[in-house]
Regions:
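Cytochrome P450
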Residues: 1-420
Length: 420
């Protein structure tokens, strides 16, 4: 972190601080801005931004208060949904995409229950050997002695393989799932990139809808399986979802993004963190039993989803500030996970941190991430297999991050492997 960025963060008038700027996360310069908000204004109002006026909630305690109160704070697309950027305005006849994450109760619970069995503990126990088999296959085929991009060869590859399994999607076309996941948040207000071809984005998302519609139709009349499409078809609340293009595309994209981003960017973030803190890396070499706790700490430290947005359904006092009905409230999970009042030495990755699981990366309350156990399982298995084969996954160049204020994505992690 440059001293210049810290000076800038301390000199800007409090009322003008805008932590939604995508370049803060691309350049990894967000820390001093959130440090200041947590200290001076954990509930902070910005009157004007690219995303309109909004409240920022930056402390761990107040984030949980908002996330846990779904009667006051709405996730519904009717009120603007879950991201600080309002959804793109659909053209005439265009599909917008709506999923259960952008619904309030009871609709949210009804549709969430349809796919929950896919990631239930009993089913995860059944697919654990498959995850391990695929992790081993990936690791055994990595180049040794030369540098390569860990994101492309490991993070993306493992999540693409698991996504194909979860959807029973054609395995040879698995990288389409990753591409469609990236498209889901590729809008200028989220990325800061005004050159995005929104027509091509829409056309490509329609290809995703078409591919999944064909997959849906191919499963009609087939024995029920534990893949996500079969689960949707065999639940009363979602059995006819294919007849509603908005809900169909929205639900598919939610499940793709949910199955991709947390795992993929935590796999990448873990390598970065362990290289930054080599003493912590040594701890898991000495005691691999720390890996499950390390996984929680990586997810805290990386925080794959930077924020979630809610909209106030009524006037509400939060942290001494008066929020009015209809106002946008943004929970900055990334900041909550660096709250020193909860996590001692919060900016450091500490693999045996006793309260690592207190992180808010998966959210809190009824919208808590449904696939959190699957993400943790994949990370645990991968690091168990890494430590059996490699003394070090060494970072050998500069990390490249994506410009995005919603997903804390990583594009390039150049590494070299050092076998045991």
């Amino acid at each position: 972190m440059s001293s210049d960025e810290s000076k800038l963060a301390s000199s800007v008038p409090l009322g003008q601080i805008d932590v939604s700027r995508p370049e803060l996360f691309r350049d990894d310069t967000w820390r001093p801005w959130f440090d200041r908000l947590r200290k001076e204004a954990p509930v902070h109002y910005l009157a004007d931004s690219v995303n309109g006026p909004f409240w920022s909630v930056s402390s761990h305690k107040l984030i949980k208060e908002v996330d846990g109160n779904n009667e006051v704070f709405s996730s519904s697309s009717e009120w603007g949904g879950i991201a600080i950027a309002d959804p793109p305005v659909a053209g005439e006849g265009e599909i917008q995409g709506q999923s259960f994450i952008t619904m309030d109760e009871p609709q949210h619970a009804q549709q969430r229950m349809a796919v929950a069995p896919t990631v239930a503990p009993t089913n995860l126990t059944e697919i654990e050997p498959l995850i391990r088999e695929r992790a081993i296959d990936i690791l055994e085929n990595l180049p040794v002695g030369k540098s390569f991009n860990w994101v492309q060869e490991v993070s993306i590859e493992l999540t693409a393989r698991m996504l194909a399994t979860l959807f029973d999607f054609p395995y040879e076309e698995r990288h389409k799932l990753v591409y469609w996941s990236d498209l889901a948040t590729a809008i200028p207000e989220v990325t800061g990139d005004d050159s995005i071809d929104m027509k091509k984005r829409y056309d490509d998302l329609m290809q995703a809808a078409g591919a999944f519609y064909q997959l849906w139709m191919s499963k009609i009349g087939q024995p029920a399986g534990f893949d996500l499409i079969s689960m949707l078809q065999n639940n009363e609340a979602t059995a006819s979802i294919n007849e509603d293009p908005d809900r169909f595309l929205g639900t598919i994209l939610l499940l793709i993004v949910g199955g991709n981003d947390t795992t993929r960017n935590s796999i990448s973030g873990g390598v970065i963190g362990l290289n930054k803190y080599p003493d912590e890396y040594q701890k898991i070499r000495d005691n691999p039993k720390l890996i499950p706790n390390m996984v929680s700490e990586i997810i805290r430290w990386q925080t794959p989803v930077i924020h979630m947005r809610r909209t106030a359904l009524q006037d509400y006092e939060l942290g001494g500030k008066q929020i009015r009905k209809g106002e946008k409230v943004v929970m900055w999970y990334l900041s909550g996970n660096r709250d020193e009042s909860v996590f001692e030495d919060a900016d450091k990755l500490i693999v045996d941190r006793p309260n690592a699981r207190a992180h808010v990366s998966f959210g809190f309350g009824v919208h808590r991430c449904m696939g959190n156990r699957l993400a943790e399982l994949q990370l645990r298995i991968l690091w168990e297999e890494i430590t059996k084969r490699f003394h070090t996954v060494e970072l050998v160049g500069d990390v490249e991050r994506i410009s995005n204020n919603f997903i804390r994505g990583i594009k390039d992690v150049p590494v070299r492997l050092h076998p045991i």
